[in-house]
């Protein structure tokens, strides 16, 4: 957990940032924004073989209950406003994981008139998972990378 020191008589000292970030990494609640074939791999990662529950990742049905949005698949111009609305409804602090080459940069349909060339043109993306479609293992690796990123963030502002 990042305990900085153990004092005599059973006292443990640590920073509030370390404790808060530890709790946040163990309770990521994603809302799915599955748009194409990448969503099948996302569902696969949530099933019994890979079991995302062991990482504290539990899929939520509503964006108001979630703090992570997984964008999986081809994002079209028509869906861009819906993606932004879902992002705005996420609880703070919120994170976005872009899954698959279509969500990362348009993918195979990059030159189509109706495709947004990456989810990062609509919402800020924290982690990119490459692949077409990425495997469930790649998604889990991306989620672990997001947990590492959350551990490094500073939650409480300090005057230095």
Curated annotation (Swiss-Prot):
InterPro entries: NADH_UbQ_OxRdtase-like_20kDa (IPR006137), NADH_UQ_OxRdtase_20Kd_su (IPR006138). Binds 1 [4Fe-4S] cluster. One of its GO terms (molecular function) is NADH:ubiquinone reductase (non-electrogenic) activity. GO terms for biological process: aerobic respiration; electron transport coupled proton transport. [4Fe-4S] cluster binds at residues 37-38, 102, 132. Keywords: 4Fe-4S, Cell inner membrane, Cell membrane, Iron, Iron-sulfur, Membrane, Metal-binding, NAD, Quinone, Translocase, Transport, Ubiquinone. PROSITE patterns: COMPLEX1_20K (PS01150). It comes from the Bacteria. Pfam families: Oxidored_q6. Its EC number is 7.1.1.-. It is found in: Cell inner membrane. One of its GO terms (cellular component) is plasma membrane. It is an enzyme of class 7 (translocase). It catalyses: a quinone + NADH + 5 H(+)(in) = a quinol + NAD(+) + 4 H(+)(out). Belongs to the complex I 20 kDa subunit family. This is NADH-quinone oxidoreductase subunit B. It comes from Neisseria meningitidis serogroup A / serotype 4A (strain DSM 15465 / Z2491).
């Amino acid at each position: 957990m990042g305990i900085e020191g153990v004092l005599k008589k059973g006292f443990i000292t640590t920073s509030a940032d370390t404790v808060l970030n530890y709790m946040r990494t163990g309770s990521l609640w994603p809302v799915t924004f599955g748009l194409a074939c990448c969503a099948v791999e996302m569902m696969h990662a949530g099933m019994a073989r890979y079991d995302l529950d062991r990482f504290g990742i539990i899929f939520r049905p509503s964006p108001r209950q979630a703090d992570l949005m997984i964008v999986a698949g081809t994002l079209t111009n028509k869906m861009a406003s819906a993606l932004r609305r879902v992002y705005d409804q996420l609880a703070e602090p919120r994170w976005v994981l872009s899954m698959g080459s279509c969500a990362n940069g348009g993918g195979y349909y990059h030159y189509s008139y109706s495709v947004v060339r990456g989810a990062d043109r609509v919402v800020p993306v924290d982690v990119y998972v490459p692949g077409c479609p990425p495997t469930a293992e790649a998604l889990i690796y991306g989620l672990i990378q997001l947990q590492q990123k959350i551990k490094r963030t500073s939650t409480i502002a300090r005057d230095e």
